[in-house]
Amino acid sequence: MATSNDQTNTKSSHSRTLLLLFIFLSLLLFSSLTIPMTRHQSTSMVAPFKRVLLESSVPASSTMDLRPKASTRRSRTSRRREFGNDAHEVPSGPNPISN
């Protein structure tokens, strides 16, 4: 009977210790988030919470047009000439370098 009381006391002391540790860590986290830091400390210790976009050096008029006007279709030979498909050969089968 003495062993069961010792086990019960040990379990309750462990749970009490864990509860106190959890409360302490919660308070520590809460206080660290609410206390304002100086500029030097905030940049060296943690990432900033609020991110601000910098002004662009490129004017907005030079951005890419996502919906360009319809262009005339090029023939297959002009596309081959443009990308040089006739100039190189693509081997088929497994990669000979890795074998």
From Swiss-Prot:
Recorded name of the encoding gene: CLE41
UniProt feature, compositional bias: Basic and acidic residues: 80-89
Hydroxyproline PTM positions: 91, 94
Glycosylation sites recorded in the entry for this protein: 94
InterPro entries xref list: CLE41/42/44
Region called Disordered, residue ranges: 60-99
Keywords: Developmental protein, Differentiation, Glycoprotein, Hydroxylation, Secreted, Signal
Transmembrane regions listed in the UniProt entry: none
Cellular component GO terms held in the UniProt record: apoplast
Gene Ontology biological process terms from the UniProt entry: axillary shoot meristem initiation; cell division; cell-cell signaling involved in cell fate commitment; maintenance of root meristem identity; phloem development; phloem or xylem histogenesis; procambium histogenesis; regulation of cell differentiation
A GO molecular-function annotation: receptor serine/threonine kinase binding
Domain of life according to the entry: Eukaryota
Name the UniProt record assigns to this protein: CLAVATA3/ESR (CLE)-related protein 41
Coiled-coil residue spans: none
Segment forming the signal sequence: 1-34
Biased composition (Basic residues): 70-79
Lineage: Eukaryota, Viridiplantae, Streptophyta, Embryophyta, Tracheophyta
PANTHER family on file: CLAVATA3/ESR (CLE)-RELATED PROTEIN 41-RELATED, CLAVATA3_ESR (CLE)-RELATED PROTEIN 41-RELATED
Family stated for the protein in its record: Belongs to the CLV3/ESR signal peptide family.
